[in-house]
Amino acid sequence: ALRVSGDSMEPMYHTGDVAWVHKQDSISNGEIGIFYLNGNTYIKELHDGPDGVYLVSLNEKYHPIQIYESDSFKIFGKVIGKCKGAEIPGFH
């Protein structure tokens, strides 16, 4: 599980939500996952197309992040569910 921070994945995920993650090293195009890119961790939708691989926010005010071969990139897992952080006693 991972606590969401920021508004880039609204309206589906909000700050304080807890995302449930299935640990795996690959996900399908269009799925939401947890990614490591150049020292930062992201919850984003993966877009793998003819113009490149991108991490895409659901909130349209954020631009897609292109992934280059020279980047340090890792897939941590697929987001399989969520709940409000307040629904989990003791989870901060």
Where are the model-predicted features located?
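Acidic/glycine-rich C-terminal interaction modules and beta/coil loop segments
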Residues: 1-92
